[in-house]
């Protein structure tokens, strides 16, 4: 796993997650647990849980990056 660890994500910061070739950009709205967060997609403004993005597994390209 490259990039940031789930435990280092912070509320109000913007991130890019890459998994199985899909790219998602989101902002963390609140912490739900030690490794789960409520997030808002920056492109569609949809709200969902971060775990929903990798609930089917983490690919070889799994990476979380902070964006500005």
Where are the regions that the model predicts?
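Mixed-charge, Lys/Arg-rich low-complexity intrinsically disordered regions
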Residues: 1-11
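Small side chains
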Residues: 3, 38-39, 57, 62
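Intrinsically disordered, low-complexity, charged/polar segments
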Residues: 45-68
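Basic/aromatic-rich interaction segments and small domains that mediate binding to polyanionic partners
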Residues: 20-50
